[in-house]
Amino acid sequence: MNNKGCIKCGSTEAGQKEIATTGTGLSKLFDVQHNRFLVVYCKNCGYSEFYNKESSTAGNILDLFFGG
């Protein structure tokens, strides 16, 4: 079984973006965006996965997305 490609549509074209979000409590009240994520998304269907920037390794995030 070939596990390469998007798990929703099978496409092998992906992109990535960084986002920042607020937490709960005071950080939400004061709009402090200290939670940073790397978003990997399928360019065909839009399926997305979020990876925590602080805990994920810098390399091969796209490999994780495609099951490699």
Curated annotation (Swiss-Prot):
InterPro entries: DUF2082_NA-bd_Znr. It comes from the Bacteria. This is Uncharacterized protein YpzJ. It comes from Bacillus subtilis (strain 168).
